[in-house]
UniProtKB/Swiss-Prot annotation:
GO terms for biological process: bone resorption; central nervous system development; nervous system development; peptide catabolic process; proteolysis. GO terms for cellular component: Golgi apparatus; lysosome; melanosome; membrane raft; recycling endosome. PANTHER family: PROTEASE S8 TRIPEPTIDYL PEPTIDASE I CLN2 (PTHR14218), TRIPEPTIDYL-PEPTIDASE 1 (PTHR14218:SF15). It comes from Bos taurus. SMART domains: Pro-kuma_activ. This is Tripeptidyl-peptidase 1. Ca(2+) binds at D517, V518, G539, G541, D543.
Length: 563
């Protein structure tokens, strides 16, 4: 029997009906609000699918993250290289051989992997993909404010049982591109403006968080920072230049990004893309900045998953990454969540600081078997990222103390147990808060978030050459906090110290030193008689609305400069 007939025999064995399993039985497959089907995809249309191959030594990877991130460890700051991580997690030869043979037999082509070899992306026709992934049925969909197009299957898929030890999930089937949660308020009318401000700008941020004109990058190090875009929108260099002309006059800054990873289209700029770039580069002023851009992606690809693949394929990356993406934990399969968590763990082992927005739905709300519960967000709930909540000025027109922004996401994971680094802080909150919701609404033993916060209300943004006021959301607070951490990395690098890396173990050991404690306000939740729209409330120390608080830059710099 020739090699081709052998492959066909292998493929026939793999697709035999009863010997199959579902890798993601709990994946939500409902069409998101605002999306509509345009009909079945043509059988000969090409799809790009990503196969997540089973990794090795994940427990050892977790131990190494703890060792390199804990200031009390002799390995603190001795981060792994991408090649070190690849040696650790690379799938077994049996896994690589089995999956490659299966895909080759199915007619997959133009397959490419990443340095860590734990993802394999291949092109197949719709006909081949539906045969390969039993049960899948691909349709064209359109939705979201930008009329984004996607090819997805809302049907469960199954894989040959022989692949169960080798494949975690297949990307490009169920998960739809995210949409923006940014809000824009009408501009308030204020009689007289002496001593007042009419919205958050870089100068307001620098005043509130005690930055001086000297708190900028030196331009002499290899320090860099990045933001990632997963929405179907763009930023424009001309908007960034205009933003800095209007608002960057009192500090040294860069007026263009150093590198765009991905494709920048020529369409209209998006407010969220503009916001991320403008405030990362004004908070982390004069520091080289990358933008990971998803526009131009194929309709069958998942933008967030593609970003994770990029991290697994670049040896030299920016030290700080800010990300404004999130999904409800319950909308994602447990297999997908656990695998993405491992990808975030890989980044932490390499000394990358990943900051994720906590979300803009407060504690969230959903109904389970007729009972309301809070609804945590992922990756905000991952124990391997630093999650950023949101605040408002007590007086929205003055640089005052901060209070909770009621939309600030926060709560307790239903997937991840509470990590040891936050045990003391969370236990103290749960035992001392006078305003806890009923225990049936949240998992008190889960990973609690956010970890920190910053202003998230009333920002000025320049988009499509137009200054736009009163833009709000944790998509604003996240790049601000990230930029300040980049400034601290600058000082550490100049002193010969390693970059901050995964911040949480150190952050919780310091008990909020270097941060303004936000003690007033509660965020929103379920609109029912039991909780009446109130989720968790802030209080002294850590809380699940604003974390440890907002940055006091000189004090935070001092706190984080110790080796």
């Amino acid at each position: 029997m020739g090699p081709r007939s052998g492959l066909l025999g292998l493929f026939a064995l793999f697709v035999a009906g009863k010997c199959s399993y579902s890798p993601e039985p709990d994946q939500q497959r409902r069409l998101p609000p605002g999306w509509v089907s345009l009909g079945r995809a043509d059988p000969e249309e090409e799809l790009s699918l990503t196969f997540a191959l089973r990794q090795q030594n994940v427990k050892r990877l977790s131990e190494l993250v703890q060792a390199v991130s804990d200031p009390g460890s002799p390995r603190y700051g001795k981060y792994l290289t991408l090649e070190d991580v690849a040696e650790l997690v690379r799938p077994s030869p049996l896994t690589l051989h089995t999956v490659q043979k299966w895909l080759l037999a199915a007619g997959a082509r133009n397959c490419h992997s990443v340095t860590t070899q734990d993802f394999l992306t291949c092109w197949l026709s719709v006909r081949q993909a539906e045969l390969l992934l039993s049960g899948a049925e691909f349709h064209h969909y359109v939705g979201g404010p930008a009329e984004t197009h996607a090819v997805r299957s809302l049907h469960p898929y199954r894989l040959p049982k022989a692949l169960a030890p080798h494949v975690d999930f297949v990307g490009g089937l169920h998960r739809f591109p995210p949409t923006s949660t940014l809000r824009q308020h009408p501009e308030p009318q204020v009689p007289g403006t002496v001593g007042l401000h009419l919205g958050v700008t870089p100068s307001v941020i620098r005043k509130r968080y005690n930055l001086t004109a000297q708190d900028v990058g030196s331009g002499t190090t290899n320090n860099s920072q990045a933001c990632a875009q997963f929405l179907e929108q763009y930023f424009h260099d001309s908007d960034l230049a205009e933003f800095m002309r209007l608002f960057g006059g009192d500090f040294a800054h860069q007026a263009s990004v150093a590198r765009v990873v991905g494709q920048q289209g020529r369409g209209r700029a998006g407010i969220e893309a503009s916001l991320d770039v403008e405030y990362l580069m004004s908070a982390g002023a004069n520091i080289s900045t990358w933008v990971y851009s998803s526009p131009g992606r194929h309709e069958s690809q998942e933008p967030f998953l593609q970003w994770l693949l990029l991290l697994s394929n670049e040896s030299a990356l920016p030290y700080v990454h800010t990300v404004s993406y999130g999904d409800d934990e319950d909308s994602l399969s447990s297999t997908y969540i656990q695998r993405v968590n491992t990808e975030l763990m890989k980044a932490a082992a390499r000394g990358l600081t990943l900051l994720f927005a906590s979300g803009d739905s407060g504690a969230g709300c959903w109904s389970v078997s007729g009972r309301h519960q809070f609804r945590p967000s992922f990756p905000a709930s991952s124990p391997y990222v630093t999650t950023v909540g949101g605040t408002s000025f007590q007086n929205p027109f003055r640089v005052t103390d901060e209070v909770v922004d009621y939309i600030s996401g926060g709560g307790f994971s239903n997937v991840f147990p509470r990590p040891s680094y936050q045990e003391e802080a969370v236990t103290r909150y749960l035992s001392s808060s006078p305003h806890l919701p009923p225990s049936s609404y949240f998992n008190a033993s889960g990973r609690a978030y956010p970890d920190v916060a910053a202003l998230s209300d009333g920002y000025w943004v320049v988009s499509n050459h137009v200054p736009i006021p009163w833009v709000s959301g944790t998509s604003a607070s996240t790049p601000v906090f990230g930029g300040l951490l980049s400034l601290i990395n600058e000082h550490r690098i100049l002193r010969g110290l390693p970059p901050l890396g995964f911040l949480n173990p150190r952050l919780y050991q310091k008990h909020g030193a270097g941060l303004f404690d936000v003690t007033r306000g509660c965020h929103e939740s379920c609109l029912n008689e039991e909780v009446e729209g109130q989720g968790f409330c802030s209080g002294p120390g850590w809380d699940p609305v604003t974390g440890w608080g907002t940055p006091n830059f000189p004090a935070l710099l001092k706190t984080l400069m110790n080796p």
